[in-house]
Each structure stands twice: as C-alpha cells, then as structure tokens.
Amino acid sequence: MTNLRKTHPLMKIINHSFIDLPAPSNISAWWNFGSLLGICLVIQILTGLFLAMHYTSDTLTAFSSVAHICRDVNYGWLIRNLHANGASMFFMCLFLHVGRGIYYGSYLYKETWNIGVILLLTVMATAFVGYVLPWGQMSFWGATVITNLLSAIPYIGTTLAEWIWGGFLVDKATLTRFFAFHFILPFIIMALVIVHLLFLHETGSNNPSGINPNSDKIPFHPYYTIKDALGLMFLLLVLLTLALFSPDSLGDPDNFSPANPLNTPPHIKPEWYFLFAYAILRSIPNKLGGVLALLASILILLIIPLLHTANQRSMMFRPVSQTLFWILTANLITLTWIGGQPVEQPFIIIGQSASILLSMLILVLMPLAGLFENYMLKPKW
C-alpha cells in the first residue's frame, strides 16, 4: 500500500513542502532563517492571541490593562515579554534572511523576492501598530510623529492623516483601529508566507555556490528538519534568555509612563529595528523628501534584481562585491545607531553621509563591482 502522506490530498501538500522536498545538499546555516521566521510568526500569533484576551483598546484603560496582564494574569508577564522580545527576534531573523538573499543572489527568483519585500513591509506595519497598543508615552508620540508624515503628501496629505486617525489627532478611534489592524495583519502575513513558499517551491532553493543544484539534491526530511530544529533551539535560547533575564533591555523607558499629549518626550524614537529607516527620514531636512527617502530605503529592495550585473549569481567567489556587501552591513548598523541619537552634530552629518552611501552602494557601486568582476574573469590572452 502506498504511504498515506503521498496519497492523501492534504498530507500530500505537506509532504511535498516539508518532507520529500528535494533540497540542495550544500545549503548552509544561512538558510535556517526562513523556518525560524515561520516559528517566530507562530510564537507571535499565539502569544498575541492570549494578550488580546485581556487587553482593552481604549485610551483610558489600555495602559492599565497591560499592567493588569503583567501583574494579575497567570504567566501574563511571560506572555507579554515573549511577545515584545519575539518581535525583536522576528526582525533580527528578517534582516539576516534578507542579507542572505542579497549575498547569495537569491533575489534572482523575482516572484519569491517581491513577495518577500511585501512581507517585510507588512511585518513592519504590524510591528508599528502593535507598538502603539500599550499606550505609553513613546507609543503615543511614535504614532503621532509617524502618522503625521502622511500630511506631507501634497493635496490629500492632511485628509489622509485625519482619515487614519479617525479624528483630528491620535485618540481613542486611532487606538481601536490600530488594535484591529494588529490583530488581522498577522493572518494576512500567514497567507503571504504560503504564497512566498509556493513561488519558492516552483524553482527550488538557491545555494551558496549560486550554481544549478539539480544534479545533487537530498530530501528535506530528515536532513534539514534536524538542521532547522537546531536553529530553533538557538532561537528559543536567545528569546527565553531575553524574556526571562532582561525583558525590557530593548524597550524604551518612556513607555512605562502613560500617554500624555501635553508632555513631549525629549527624544522620540521607534524600536531598534526601525532606527535605520528613522535615521534616513531625519537626515533629509525636508518633510516630503524625508518620507520619500524612508519609503525608498525599503522599496529599493524591489529593484535589486534589475541591478544584478555579475555573471556569477552568488557573492561567494566575488571579493569586490563581498567587500561592498560588508560595507553596506556596517553602514546599516551605523544608521541604526544614528537613529537612536539626538538630532545634533556630529550625528546629523554622520546620518546624512550614511544615507548617501547606502543609496550609492546599492544603485551604483555594487552594479559596477559586478561589471568589474566580469571583466577580471575574462581571459586576457
């Protein structure tokens, strides 16, 4: 009799996706982050669901309901700490996953890459609306500053901002709709993840060498299920260490104060995973220009496949491109640092220089490096 997992209509899909899936034999630990992101999403949905059971999306009670979760609900403190730090782990895995895609040329699977960029934007939107929910000082002022950027759009900007707010300022209507968005978006993300995997399984995984791996494939289970399980252990170790020993180290102290529209915090800044984009936004002295630069910093990922000039897919054997890639990484870390600093010299000029370098690296230097490497590979005799 044929195995049930190969004949049953539902089991067959799971079998072709996670068990008998042919996978390249040489994919490294950098390919673990896809499965880790899936686990992060499940953790966030489950912890978020339990938090939503006790949370109230009202300006008068939101802050105290979060305090109630931490003090009175059984293991509420743990659920909240896992959810808050789980978001940081999610973004850490996301950035490493995108970085791996750029380094090894995975962006040449255009459909998978484009859905991935849409996923990144959706996760960022989810994290932003989620950060507003505790209704602390930084939640309120973060929501005010970021939603206010919509008013920079010519002609329809102010109308758009007021439409998002549900009034003339960030208030009860805003909090209620942000809770609704924060609840629904993870399920939209789940649907997009399935589409992402659908496109990926059309082509099969890329591999570190960047060459066609069809001549040497192995089954996903048990080889990569075990490998992913090891990655999961590391993820849980870091997440639990953060959540149990230092749960507030990545948060902002201002968020321990209830939202007060009459008192502006000295430094309004988002969570660490948005700081690079926030630094780019602040580096341009014009409001509309800043908003466009902020959008461009993420949407630039969509044109990376069009800027690939090298004959080789991966950067594994391309030292010049490798050097530029690590300069890009250092540049993004610098922008993250700048985003958390006050708007004063020398931070302003460092932020502006890093923002210019970022666009130069992606739009000019890396495509030129690809052409240079092609030239160097040509026989000279």
UniProtKB/Swiss-Prot annotation:
Residues that, per the record, bind heme b b566: 97, 196
Cofactor binding, note field: Binds 2 heme b groups non-covalently.
Entries under Gene3D superfamilies matching the protein: Cytochrome Bc1 Complex, Chain C
Entry GO CC: mitochondrial inner membrane; respiratory chain complex III
Subcellular location: Mitochondrion inner membrane
Origin species: Ningaui yvonnae
Subunit-level organization: The cytochrome bc1 complex contains 11 subunits: 3 respiratory subunits (MT-CYB, CYC1 and UQCRFS1), 2 core proteins (UQCRC1 and UQCRC2) and 6 low-molecular weight proteins (UQCRH/QCR6, UQCRB/QCR7, UQCRQ/QCR8, UQCR10/QCR9, UQCR11/QCR10 and a cleavage product of UQCRFS1). This cytochrome bc1 complex then forms a dimer.
Membrane topology: Multi-pass membrane protein
Molecular function terms, GO-annotated: metal ion binding; ubiquinol-cytochrome-c reductase activity
Transmembrane segments: 33-53, 77-98, 113-133, 178-198, 226-246, 288-308, 320-340, 347-367
Signal peptide: none
Function: Component of the ubiquinol-cytochrome c reductase complex (complex III or cytochrome b-c1 complex) that is part of the mitochondrial respiratory chain. The b-c1 complex mediates electron transfer from ubiquinol to cytochrome c. Contributes to the generation of a proton gradient across the mitochondrial membrane that is then used for ATP synthesis.
Domain of life of the organism encoding this protein: Eukaryota
Main localization category: mitochondrion
Cofactor(s) in the UniProt record: heme b
Keywords: Electron transport, Heme, Iron, Membrane, Metal-binding, Mitochondrion, Mitochondrion inner membrane, Respiratory chain, Transmembrane, Transmembrane helix, Transport, Ubiquinone
PROSITE patterns in alphabetical order: CYTB_CTER, CYTB_NTER
GO biological process: mitochondrial electron transport, ubiquinol to cytochrome c
Family: Belongs to the cytochrome b family.
Cross-referenced PANTHER family: CYTOCHROME B
Extra remark beyond the main annotation: Heme 1 (or BL or b562) is low-potential and absorbs at about 562 nm, and heme 2 (or BH or b566) is high-potential and absorbs at about 566 nm.
Pfam families: Cytochrom_B_C, Cytochrome_B
Name under which the protein is recorded: Cytochrome b
Binding site for a ubiquinone: 201
UniProt binding sites for heme b b562: 83, 182
